């Protein structure tokens, strides 16, 4: 990866779909975040163009004769690979309480396998059971029987109908890979055993089941239950169900002529960032002259990348929350091919940017930022929301120097004290031990992230780091955090409490949640009421000369001209329609007080395509 030439390096977010879909609740995307890719860092764009479009539902593939080149040292194909032009159905349904077998279903083979993560390349031992109906089910421990095993133990559920198998000896000896294509992307599931005999037994068993299912035209069983719809991704939702998911509060278009916000209501000033999903543009609302950051996303890419769930979550959280240290939403609307979020614009830069230039912050400055972060997270927790992706790149400063938490795509709703989730997501360097250890986790996961960012501020480095993710995860799980000699005992005690491996023993991990942290001696000088009211002056004020000063944004983008070109030259720019796939997406807040009667509101349905 090409990172900014700073002391710190940007960390890429890893996201996963529904609990235990396909890969131990790990269908992560491995995004590549560069220093110039501001859209993925600033305004809630936590997914990236290099994501693998895996999903929690059945993934249908068609084999092709020519395989795209992936590495210079191509793996050796097994001599017995399946014939081409077959269908490969690698499904990853959600965990259910059990999968009762039919009378015709039999266990073909079972035993321990090492399974490799698709993007975070660590190996995990799983007990797999191959059934005659094509299901390859992976468990944390050996199940008594698959019909009565609790969902906590079922981590993988693949269907191998029509799969192609390759045997390789990299990166571990006795490895075999199940491969297929989704869209134009190669999808792989990688396993390893201890001997050539074991590998031969597994590959032959899988190949025989796969071939038989194709020969007889059987369709592998895939449970339809979804136990966690908040995290489920696009491919698991039928179009009619998806439409319901996008029904959100707000003013929507109707035949009575109710005014709507469109792209025509804004004057576009500068490009703040761009990526595969779209652009973030600094704009001025014509009726009020107020500045906003408008994030314009491509629907087609959101659907193809299976990012509907994260977009839905982001939309819900933005609409339902109101806190001085969280980015806020003014409007959301859509064109025929775009989703548009009009969001609060802050131009003080990322904490990552500032810390990269200053190397460390003083304890007083860290205390101030930490207090505002803790206040924001405590508010989210009070609303039943956990954040799950705390890192310096997602922490912005406004023009006065106050914290603004951005990027809500990985939030999890309906998690209060005692309630847990198990989706594997976050950023590798910030992952809590309980997430890495496949345990259910709750609110305490955010306090681990708080400990990591505050450690970075005070110490100028991550508490645990290694370029090799296997080593990194081992450090997070077993290594004790070390502190430099020059920090105070209060700071050391706070960080040690936040970075406790056991979430039950972690500071803030109890029923009192945020209150336990606020009562720590390190924050003795903080008046929490005054903090929320912004009565405490920030220790640093960004050096911006005006609201349109974009010095903390990448000049690669801010120097670009803003071009919005309708595909139909005769159609007005920015006209919108609530098409069936995304009905009632619009959220327009107190529109009547801001648009004014002179605003031109278009009612046609032509597209607004961005160059």
From Swiss-Prot:
It catalyses: L-seryl-[protein] + ATP = O-phospho-L-seryl-[protein] + ADP + H(+); L-threonyl-[protein] + ATP = O-phospho-L-threonyl-[protein] + ADP + H(+). InterPro entries: AGC-kinase_C, Kinase-like_dom_sf, PH-like_dom_sf, PH_domain, PH_PKB, Pkinase_C, Prot_kinase_dom, Protein_kinase_ATP_BS. One of its GO terms (molecular function) is protein serine kinase activity. Pfam families: PH, Pkinase, Pkinase_C. Signal peptide: none annotated. Residues 524-597 form the AGC-kinase C-terminal domain. It is found in: Cytoplasm, Cytosol; Cell membrane. Ubiquitously expressed. Present in ovary, where it is concentrated at the basal side of follicle cells. Residues 14-25 have a biased composition (Low complexity). Gene3D superfamilies: Phosphorylase Kinase, domain 1, Pleckstrin-homology domain (PH domain)/Phosphotyrosine-binding domain (PTB), Transferase(Phosphotransferase) domain 1. Disulfide bonds: none annotated. Residues 266-523 form the Protein kinase domain. GO terms for cellular component: cell cortex; cytosol; neuronal cell body; nucleus; plasma membrane. Binding of the PH domain to the phosphatidylinositol 3-kinase alpha (PI(3)K) results in its targeting to the plasma membrane. Belongs to the protein kinase superfamily. AGC Ser/Thr protein kinase family. RAC subfamily. Serine/threonine kinase involved in various developmental processes. During early embryogenesis, acts as a survival protein. During mid-embryogenesis, phosphorylates and activates trh, a transcription factor required for tracheal cell fate determination. Also regulates tracheal cell migration. Later in development, acts downstream of PI3K and Pk61C/PDK1 in the insulin receptor transduction pathway which regulates cell growth and organ size, by phosphorylating and antagonizing FOXO transcription factor. Controls follicle cell size during oogenesis. Interacts with trbl. This is RAC serine/threonine-protein kinase. The lineage of its organism: Eukaryota, Metazoa, Ecdysozoa, Arthropoda, Hexapoda. The gene is Akt.
């Amino acid at each position: 990866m090409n990172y900014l030439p700073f002391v710190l390096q940007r960390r890429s977010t890893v996201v996963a779909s529904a609990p235990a879909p396909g890969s131990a609740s790990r269908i992560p995307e491995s995004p590549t975040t560069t220093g110039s890719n501001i859209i993925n860092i600033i305004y809630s764009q936590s997914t990236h163009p290099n994501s693998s479009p895996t999903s929690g539902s059945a993934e249908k593939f068609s084999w092709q004769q020519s395989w795209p080149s992936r590495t210079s040292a191509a793996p050796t194909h097994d001599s017995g690979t399946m014939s081409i032009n077959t269908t490969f159905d690698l499904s990853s349904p959600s965990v259910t309480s059990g999968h009762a077998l039919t009378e015709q279903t039999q266990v073909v083979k079972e035993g321990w396998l090492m399974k490799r993560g698709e993007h975070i390349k660590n190996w995990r031992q799983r007990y797999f059971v191959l059934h005659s109906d094509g299901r390859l089910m992976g468990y944390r421990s050996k199940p008594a029987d698959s019909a009565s095993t609790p969902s906590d133990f079922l981590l993988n559920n693949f269907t191998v109908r029509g799969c192609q198998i390759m045997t390789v000896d990299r990166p571990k000896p006795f490895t075999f890979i199940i491969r297929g294509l989704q869209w134009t992307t190669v999808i792989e599931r990688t396993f390893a055993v201890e001997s050539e005999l074991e590998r031969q037994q597994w590959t032959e068993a899988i190949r025989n089941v796969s071939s038989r299912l194709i020969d007889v035209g059987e369709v592998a069983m895939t449970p339809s239950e979804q136990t966690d719809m908040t995290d489920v991704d696009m491919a698991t939702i039928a179009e009619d169900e998806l439409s319901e998911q996008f029904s959100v509060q707000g003013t929507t278009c109707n035949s009575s002529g109710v005014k709507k916000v469109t792209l025509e209501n804004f004057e576009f000033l500068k490009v703040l960032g761009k990526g595969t999903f779209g652009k973030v543009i600094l704009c001025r609302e014509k009726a009020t002259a107020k500045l906003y950051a408008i994030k314009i996303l491509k629907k087609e890419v959101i659907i193809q990348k299976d990012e509907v769930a994260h977009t839905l979550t982001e939309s819900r959280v933005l609409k339902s929350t109101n806190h001085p240290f969280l980015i806020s939403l003014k409007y959301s609307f859509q064109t025929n091919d775009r989703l548009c979020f009009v969001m609060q614009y802050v131009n003080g830069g990322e904490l990552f940017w500032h810390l990269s230039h200053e190397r460390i912050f003083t304890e007083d400055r860290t205390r101030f930022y930490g207090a505002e972060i803790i206040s924001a997270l405590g508010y989210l927790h009070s609303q039943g929301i956990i954040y799950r992706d705390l890192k310096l790149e997602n922490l912005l400063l406004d023009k006065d120097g106050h914290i603004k938490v951005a990027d809500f795509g990985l939030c999890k709703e309906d998690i209060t004290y005692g309630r847990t989730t198990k989706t594997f997501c976050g950023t590798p360097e910030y992952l809590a031990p309980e997430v890495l250890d496949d345990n259910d986790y709750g609110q305490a996961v955010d306090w681990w992230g708080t400990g990591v960012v505050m450690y970075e501020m005070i110490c100028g480095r991550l508490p645990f780091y290694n370029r090799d993710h296997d080593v990194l995860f081992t450090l997070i799980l077993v290594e004790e955090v070390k502190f430099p000699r020059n920090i105070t005992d209060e700071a050391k005690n706070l960080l040690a409490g936040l970075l406790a491996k056991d979430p039950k023993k972690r500071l803030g991990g109890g029923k009192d949640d945020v209150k336990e942290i606020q009562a720590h001696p390190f924050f003795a000088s903080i008046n929490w009421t005054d903090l929320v009211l912004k009565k405490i002056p920030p220790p640093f004020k960004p050096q911006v000369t005006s609201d349109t000063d974009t010095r903390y944004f990448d000049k690669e983008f801010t120097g670009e001209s803003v071009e919005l070109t309708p595909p139909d030259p005769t159609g007005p720019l920015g006209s919108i329609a609530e098409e069936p796939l995304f009905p009632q997406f619009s959220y327009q807040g107190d529109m009547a007080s801001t648009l004014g009667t002179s605003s031109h509101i278009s009612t046609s349905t032509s597209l607004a395509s961005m160059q």
